[in-house]
Amino acid sequence: KIKAFAKINLALDVIGKREDGYHEVEIIMQSINLHDKLILFPAPVLSLETKNRRLPIDDRNLIIKAAKKIREFTGTQSGARIILNKNIPVGAGLGGGSADAAAALVGLNKLWSLNLSLSTLEKLAVSVGADVPFCLTGGTVLAKGIGEKLTILPSLPAEPIFLTKPPFTVSTAMVYKNLSLSSIDRHPDIKSILSIINTGEIYSINDYWGNVLEKATFKLFPEVKEVMQWLSEKGFPVRMTGSGPTLFMFRSSGNSNFKEIKFKLRELGWWTYEGALEGRGLEVTV
């Protein structure tokens, strides 16, 4: 059994576009305690099961892609029955698919007694997806390149957070397609955020954080911008994670408007989640 933790972006900056079409980024990634769960059993063939009917269970799923990469690398023909209990919303900018793929790599390495090192798993992870290497370790990490160059940062305390997501998904590819690098008027102050992380004073991050994909997502889905502005007016410093549409904020339990906020969002059909920062990407239990 493996818990695969979701992630948020404390800052997301796009530096430029490479010749191969990928974007150069600087991202501060942070695990949160919202998680999927994978259960793996020995089996004669490779299969994936989930009750979430929106998810493919073939090669389009990163779990199967990860399993085939590890098979191809090692030459093993072992099978596995993988059951996915899905809690992280799909297409939400929370890295659920990447977390599941990382869990599959670690779980199959153990199930099939392959004894691959973490560095080998990280190389396989890059070939599965840009966020998968981060999900292997999790915690608080600075990612550069296309997201594969990772620097592990000091762990942040388990501060309470609040997430909310509209009743639709967002295509990351579509957001990047609509991103105009020349129109970005404010970049997150990564250097200052790194200094704050070193001190652990997470609440002072609000002056420096940012996500340059917000403008592109807001153009496609103006209701996300409207809710973000409404939350800001209510006194909640709020940001979008990834390509959206999920919004997140740090919160103190003493905020009197919080119940009203949750009620209104649910009235609008938005999903909500109260959780905390997490220091790991995965949790493996026998």
Residue ranges and their predicted role:
Residues 83-112, 130, 237-251:
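Glycine/serine-rich anion-binding loops at beta->alpha junctions
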Residues 12, 36-40, 131-135, 141-142, ...:
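Short beta-strand scaffold segments in enzyme catalytic cores
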